[in-house]
Amino acid sequence: MAEIHDITGLLKPYLSGTNLVWTLLLVGYIIPKLFQYLQRLFSPVSRIPGSWLHKLTSLPLKIAIAKGESHIFTVDLHKKYGPIVTLSPTMISISDAREIKRIVHTEDWAKSEAVYGNFRQDPQRPTLLAFTDKKAYSQRKRLVSSMFGLRYIRSMQPLMRNCISVLMDELDKQCANGATAVDMQHMIQSLAADIIGVTTFGQTFDLVKNGSHPLPDRLKQALKLSGILQFMPWLTKIPFIPNRDPYVSWFTNEIVAKRRAQIASRQGPPREDLLQKMIEAADESPTSPFRVSDIQDESVVLLIAGSETTANAELFTLIHLLRHPSKLATLYEEIDRWYPRNDPRPTDCDYSMSGMVYLQACIDETMRLVPGQATGSPRESRKDETLLGYDIPKGTTVFPTTQEVHLDETLWPNATEFLPERWLDVYAKGEANSLPYYPFSAGSRVCIGKHFAAQEMHLSLVSLLRRFQFEYVSGQDESTVFRIAQQMRGHRYLMTVGRR
């Protein structure tokens, strides 16, 4: 009893009033933090080049992400420290072409749980984008692969062309009295959203006609938030920040319910869109890998990824062409060879896509210079690894940075210049797949919608350039931000548009 009394006496000064608060703070936070920092100082990651601050805390990376500047943050670090750098205590970036190929293609590392684990509406049921388990991903991919097969995508051309026709009519109205400045950023983004609406849900959002629609507007906000939540998951624990946007949930649930009712009552022939395919693939059995609830989440991903990334690629392609009038003139010549002026033939991928090599070169060159996945799709070391001679502990997130390998002067002479011609010899030799070029990632996680995007870009750009003349408007902000995908920082971009 005396010993207990002595211990109580020793602790008494620390168990009263303000002292108790400081004691709890010391034991519960400060000491564990000090141990954490010591672990980080002696971790193998600490030996990788980079700022000592980044090896201790992820705060600088999180600030860059919140500002939409993680791609700039990464570029600056690689310029200063070389081909492998520390981003945070558990995240690194690599720009070496051989190691990137090994990670994303040869060894096909799994996606990072630390990143994609936070990119889920339902933590227990990932979308195709957010699977980190290879086996589960393969199972889901098999279920939906028929929806993205080339034959099925080609069958969507009439739906896409209808949306493009609406845009063409709108541009005709705007330049009826001669060439005029048009916000082509808004127009192209609206077109992409309308195309995703009609091909996914069987209904257009009429964004081109009306200028706005609640769903795409809410999804743009969700896109910004998703980019932040990937690296700051603790924000989801704040009560007033929901995992799902209420309007998006209501809209997608309503659409799915109506379509299921139509199918059950056999009202008319089956619709030819992605929603129909997903509903047909869904199974409500307890062990089902794809339920009706999964349709909503996959639909949201299709809307965000399908409209934003494709629209950005189209917009950046036009911007680069307008900056280089001689390249634009060459493209007009190619378009006129395939589709002579006043030719009534509709733009058709089966007819012209494989033959219009200069257009494809312009698109590929743009996606090389401004890749959608600027910092690369983050992967994870599932065992202890070695990269460029450095030990990489199991569980480390590795960013195989696309933008750095795309701008490597040793791989791409005059790397920062827009030179579509560099691709023509590559195509002729059949070497496109051997290049260090990853606009759609690679390996098993190559973008499942790449053929959909390629078709939409071909139809949209060819149709626009067949009818309209575009000219550059100088003095605009052309800087980019990175939020899930690389995009324009500003919310409008003007081009002078007139009839040819």
Swiss-Prot record:
Primary location recorded for the protein, binned into one broad class: membrane
GO CC field: membrane
EC number assigned by the record: 1.-.-.-
Keywords: Glycoprotein, Heme, Iron, Membrane, Metal-binding, Monooxygenase, Oxidoreductase, Transmembrane, Transmembrane helix
Required cofactor names: heme
Alphabetical list of SUPFAM superfamilies matching this protein: Cytochrome P450
Glycan attachment points: 210, 414
InterPro entries linked to this entry: Cyt_P450, Cyt_P450_CS, Cyt_P450_E_grp-I, Cyt_P450_sf, Cytochrome_P450_monoxygenase
Pathway(s) served: Secondary metabolite biosynthesis
ATP-binding found in the keyword field: no
GO MF annotations in UniProt: heme binding; iron ion binding; monooxygenase activity; oxidoreductase activity, acting on paired donors, with incorporation or reduction of molecular oxygen
Residues where heme binds: 447
Function, in words: Cytochrome P450 monooxygenase; part of the cluster that mediates the biosynthesis of acurin A, a highly reduced polyketide coupled to a serine via a peptide bond. The activities of the highly reducing polyketide synthase acrA and the nonribosomal peptide synthetase acrB are collectively responsible for the synthesis of the acurin A core structure with a heptaketide backbone produced by acrA covalently fused to a L-serine by acrB. After the formation of the PK-NRP hybrid product, it is detached from acrB by reductive release to set up the formation of the lactam ring by aldol condensation.
Family per similarity comment: Belongs to the cytochrome P450 family.
Protein name: Cytochrome P450 monooxygenase acrD
Gene: acrD
